[in-house]
Amino acid sequence: MFFKDILISSHTILPSLVRVQNRMLVRIKLFECLIEHILNHVHHWSFRKAVRNNFVVEEIYYWRQIQLAPIDCKFSNIGNPLLVWPRSLEISLENIRGGLPYLSSVRAVSLDLNRCFK
């Protein structure tokens, strides 16, 4: 594991699944997602910064428990992300801040597009 010794101070995972039936609905969906995104951020803004859960990051490796970070990690939920695509994509964004604050990885998985555009 390349980043095994990095102390992780926060870990944010933003999964979202957006389906659009045809390309004409992209603008309507964009507006709906924007309104939902704004309302969610207004509703959860104070709780996001104040309320956090502390967990210790651990890994099971060959039936042994390995502690990756000796400090508690803070997990925070940012609410509904604003992700609108003209196709059906599953977006998984992981942002790990610790020793290297610029680490991030984005994974996009294409779903069955023929079923969505019928």
UniProtKB/Swiss-Prot annotation:
UniProt keyword list: Transposable element
Other noteworthy facts: IS150 is related to IS2, IS3, IS51, IS600 and IS629. IS103 is considered to be a variant of IS150.
Protein name per its UniProtKB record: Insertion element IS150 uncharacterized 14 kDa protein
Organism: Escherichia coli
